[in-house]
């Protein structure tokens, strides 16, 4: 068993060290992570400049790119062997609902999935690493289970969110669907030293769809949320309606 460990908070983040330790003894480990915090970079790849890779004193490799860059470079030339599993995290804060579209943590795992490798993204529900030990224990337990009993044939992608509470207070694992958030808060406008306007992206919106069965609901109730993800963004339920509309629009536009 060979495991690739990545993240989006950077190679110095406590969450990465905790996930690496959670994987100790489960196989050969390779760690490839961003040089700097790259939260919110989604699935971006760096195409406008070359990437450099360095090795830290603890053996972690890090590069001046995005989380997706890290996994992509690892899988397409950096590593001597293809990993059997890709794990990403442990993120400093939740990646639930719409967060998954922006998350570098999820993106790193998704990059592994795109290459046909089972992959898991781990996130602690609140910022600050208060119960990082809880998240690490959950990660260890889940990784052990998927190694011992693969859930489905072939590649798969899981998004795991762990409540920020003592391990003894967890209420178990739940399979969930993604919830939804309200739109983000307005941008924060400030001025630079020249008096020119600058903008900071506003905070994420509150949960909008957080009913039973969603990741938001599970975590709020003290459950570890386990959400299977896929890459296909097609709205299959709307395909017939759009097909009919295009036929009508085409006839009307002649």
UniProtKB/Swiss-Prot annotation:
HAMAP family: SurE (MF_00060). SUPFAM superfamilies: SurE-like. This is 5'-nucleotidase SurE. NCBIfam families: PRK00346.1-3, PRK00346.1-4, surE. Pfam families: SurE. A divalent metal cation binds at residues 8-9, 39, 91. Its cofactor is a divalent metal cation. Binds 1 divalent metal cation per subunit.
